[in-house]
Design a protein with these regions (language model features):
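N-terminal helix-turn-helix DNA-binding core of bacterial DNA-binding proteins
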Residues: 15-19, 23-26, 30-77, 103
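Alpha-helical structural elements of signaling/regulatory helical domains
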Residues: 45, 62, 77, 116, ...
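Alpha-helical linker/hinge and terminal dimerization helices associated
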Residues: 28, 32-35, 39, 71, ...
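Short hydrophobic/aromatic-rich motifs at helix boundaries and adjacent loops
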Residues: 4-11, 21-24, 35-37, 54, ...
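C-terminal regulatory/oligomerization modules of transcriptional regulators
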Residues: 1-14, 119, 130, 134-154
């Protein structure tokens, strides 16, 4: 049996559907991920893995906790993704001076795959700029940095 919906509830639901930042961000993230997935086809790397490898390469050896924070990933997601990269022989994980610390570096295979994927990333960036226009691309990239502020205020 279908419940009747009063106008207040209908208005609230329409407002949610039209303006929910979370829903819009998730939808946008899926669209961007599919876009980059197409450009990364044939690289043996997913865009998320590529991003992790870039973060490692820039600061290696990097403590796992620092990299996870830099990438904005929760511990569970980061650990799962890192496990796949380690299993595939792309990263090496060693103990730091403090036995509790784990340091991540790229293996030779990880560096090779990262290097091979960079042209695909460059193509994806250019395609995104062509699709959105340079100004919209820049505005979107800047706007996507803003949600990090949510975590600073908690």
């Amino acid at each position: 049996m279908k419940d009747a919906m009063d106008s207040r509830e209908r208005d609230a639901l329409r407002n949610i559907s039209a303006s929910c930042l979370c829903a819009k961000a998730r939808k946008a993230a899926r669209a961007v991920t599919r876009f980059y997935d197409r450009h990364f086809a044939g690289t043996d790397l997913e865009p998320g893995q590529f991003t992790i490898l870039v973060g490692i390469r820039l600061t290696e050896p990097v403590p796992t906790a620092r990299l996870a924070e830099h990438l904005g990933l929760d511990r569970t997601t980061f650990t799962r993704n890192l496990g796949v990269l380690e299993r595939d022989g792309l990263v090496a994980i060693e103990r730091g001076e403090d036995a509790r610390q784990r340091l991540i570096s790229l293996t030779a295979e990880g560096r090779r795959r990262l290097k091979a994927a960079i042209p695909r990333w460059e193509q994806a960036q250019q395609a995104a700029i062509s699709t959105l226009g340079k100004e919209n691309f820049s505005d979107l990239a800047a706007a996507l940095s803003l949600p990090a502020e949510f975590n600073k205020s908690e």
